[in-house]
Amino acid sequence: MKNDSRTFGASTVLTKTQNIGRISQIIGPVLDVTFPPGKMPNIYNSLIVKGQNTAGQEINVTCEVQQLLGNNKVRAVAMSATDGLMRGMDVVDTGAALSVPVGEATLGRIFNVLGEPVDNLGPVDASTTFPIHRSAPAFTQLDTKLSIFETGIKVVDLLAPYRRGGKIGLFGGAGVGKTVLIMELINNIAKAHGGVSVFGGVGERTREGNDLYMEMKESKVINEENISESKVALVYGQMNEPPGARMRVGLTALTMAEYFRDVNKQDVLLFIDNIFRFVQAGSEVSALLGRMPSAVGYQPTLSTEMGTLQERITSTKEGSITSIQAVYVPADDLTDPAPATTFAHLDATTVLSRGLAAKGIYPAVDPLDSTSTMLQPWIVGEEHYETAQGVKETLQRYKELQDIIAILGLDELSEEDRLVVARARKIERFLSQPFFVAEVSTGSPGKYVSLAETIKGFQMILSGELDSFPEQAFYLVGNIDEATAKAANLQMEN
């Protein structure tokens, strides 16, 4: 044994009693390591390879044990590039799973999968660390109440409400407003619920991660002057990282969120962008470990891996983690095993529509395609349910009439249908809303609309009280009183 005492990563201190093995085989990001008899590390233990490559450069690679092969060998997956590693190099067993910093010190900072800051703002002053592999809360700790998580965004709260401690799938292509919607949710949970957010960038583009960070600084979600006032911690494992890092970065983000829920007893928003990349990384690792692939080439452990992550995202009696997960659907095939497995865990879906974005209606949430298991009369109440159904029926009828309008024009419709179209166009515009985080771009101040105000506004449109108002009065306003005031101003101008 080497007499060595150094500190590595977030929380692993290596001492005299080190358990040291040697690399016996390297296949890409997978290492086989031989340990002395009776000194085998456990599954999920963190191993550290330190040394120098042939060019004399320092090497520091963290790996995670995935398989015990027999003959005193383990197979581990590297969390960073394995360039420069050689057979025969010493590998130190840390004796514990990978641990990452948690707590207030993480807010406003960017971390990698190992919990190391990557934003050039110096070390993180975190006194507490948690292992990334933790069991889900016990059944007795779970909160069984079905309660709505109010976001202050009209279209979401009315038509596809989020469940407190639930999981929401966010569907949308490039450039339809996913990032702005995510930032508005982060802003609103901080202001209305006193909560914090954790953003896990899993296997997405580095450019997008950088853009998100810059936009968060611009909209003051991350406060550069006083970093402790920031509302979000960012954890990135992007496309260029090895599959081991992409597979575990979701767990790192979740572990940071669990601290705020379990210790600080807060409501937390956890964003995962993109949950499909988590599955994809698991599939790569599974193939590298030599497992027989399952349907469509995915890993045989797909459901287990997804379940292990998703079951930790829940409400307890102390606090909640509400998760919003961007879902990439490969080749738009909803029956593909990756999205199909994800759907089994979702409580609501928010679908962003390019058609609405093209009309300038933001947030471009599709009111007919977005769904929620919470939209039941015994959960949200009769009034909310009836209003939501009325809005959906009106919009659906308008959608059916659009072909006739395109060919024959509005004048050929019956009086009743013309009224439906007029109300639907008002509803469509009233579903738009100015965002706090977009103030910089739009110039109009953001609005948080309570659920009661939202229901009242749509009831007034459906009942015909506001039929005389011009439809532009409903565009990009908060509650219905603002629409009334805007209508009065428009009439004055005319």
From Swiss-Prot:
MF (Gene Ontology): ATP binding; ATP hydrolysis activity; proton-transporting ATP synthase activity, rotational mechanism
Pfam families: ATP-synt_ab, ATP-synt_ab_N, ATP-synt_VA_C
EC number(s) per entry: 7.1.2.2
Gene Ontology cellular component list: chloroplast thylakoid membrane; mitochondrion; proton-transporting ATP synthase complex
Keyword vocabulary terms for this entry: ATP synthesis, ATP-binding, CF(1), Chloroplast, Hydrogen ion transport, Ion transport, Membrane, Nucleotide-binding, Plastid, Thylakoid, Translocase, Transport
Reactions catalysed, as given in the entry: ATP + H2O + 4 H(+)(in) = ADP + phosphate + 5 H(+)(out)
UniProt-listed Gene3D superfamilies: 2.40.10.170, Bovine Mitochondrial F1-atpase, Atp Synthase Beta Chain, Chain D, domain 3, P-loop containing nucleotide triphosphate hydrolases
Subcellular compartments: Plastid, Chloroplast thylakoid membrane
Residues bound to ATP: G172, G173, A174, G175, V176, G177, K178, T179
Membrane topology: Peripheral membrane protein
GO biological process, any: proton motive force-driven mitochondrial ATP synthesis
Known partners and oligomeric status: F-type ATPases have 2 components, CF(1) - the catalytic core - and CF(0) - the membrane proton channel. CF(1) has five subunits: alpha(3), beta(3), gamma(1), delta(1), epsilon(1). CF(0) has four main subunits: a(1), b(1), b'(1) and c(9-12).
NCBIfam families found in the cross-reference section: atpD
Family: Belongs to the ATPase alpha/beta chains family.
Function: Produces ATP from ADP in the presence of a proton gradient across the membrane. The catalytic sites are hosted primarily by the beta subunits.
Name the UniProt record assigns to this protein: ATP synthase subunit beta, chloroplastic
Species the sequence originates in: Physcomitrium patens
Gene: atpB
